[in-house]
């Protein structure tokens, strides 16, 4: 598993190439479709990358009054996010994090929390901490929207997943530190209500998309 410094170094170098991760598009579109963004007032994205998703949401899906806060460990990604959301700069805040899953936000300050292809990069402890932090930051009834690499459900996707896992075992750097995981065990049914969960296969790569509503404060 890559440590925070290794993750930062990799994604600082990876930069704009992040937007060429073709297998992510179908999962992200599904996440948008089930995210209820038409009523969003404050969106937080952990692992904002180049800001491509943010720019799409701000241009097409959220109200003109919606505020967006994006965080990323990579300085390169933060600079790209600022550039790609320049048109909406009055409503956008981009924060470079130190890699900690602790969030610099007040309790109950957002109604949408997004983490796409991030939890599959984190340790189990950091992933659970991020889930707890998302719960703290979200308003009651707010939605957490997640997407990650996951386990295959068809012969082809199982083969791709097996190859990916093999490369990760050989050297996590080869696959950017990401490996297939399952999101469901991270979602505590005592404080979250899962409203959508689906495995989406694109070009043989399996992704899990999950949307859950905060049910308790």
Can you say where each PLM-predicted feature lies in the sequence?
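C-terminal alpha-helical "lid/dimerization" subdomain adjacent to the S-adenosyl-L-methionine
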Residues: 147-190
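A short SAM/SAH-binding and catalytic strip from SAM-dependent methyltransferases
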Residues: 112-125
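A short acidic, Gly/Pro-enriched loop at the edge of an enzyme's catalytic core
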Residues: 103-113
């Amino acid at each position: 598993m890559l440590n925070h410094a290794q993750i930062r170094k990799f994604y600082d170098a990876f930069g704009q190439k992040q937007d060429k991760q073709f297998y992510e598009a179908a999962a992200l579109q599904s996440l948008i479709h089930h995210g209820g963004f038409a009523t969003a007032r404050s969106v937080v994205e952990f692992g904002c990358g180049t800001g491509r998703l943010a720019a799409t949401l701000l241009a097409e899906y959220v109200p003109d009054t919606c505020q967006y806060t994006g965080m990323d460990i990579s300085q390169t990604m933060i600079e790209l996010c600022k550039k790609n959301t320049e048109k909406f700069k009055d409503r956008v805040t981009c924060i470079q994090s130190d890699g900690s899953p602790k969030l610099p936000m007040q309790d109950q300050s957002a109604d949408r929390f997004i983490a796409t292809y991030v939890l599959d990069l984190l340790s189990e402890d950091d992933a659970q901490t991020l889930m707890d932090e998302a719960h703290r930051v979200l308003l009651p009834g707010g939605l957490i929207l997640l997407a990650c690499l996951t386990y295959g459900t068809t012969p082809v996707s199982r083969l791709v997943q097996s190859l990916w896992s093999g490369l990760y075992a050989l050297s996590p750097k080869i696959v950017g530190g990401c490996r297939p995981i399952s999101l469901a065990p991270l979602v505590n049914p005592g404080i979250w209500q899962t409203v959508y969960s689906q495995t989406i296969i694109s070009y043989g790569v399996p992704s899990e998309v999950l949307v859950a509503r905060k049910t308790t404060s």
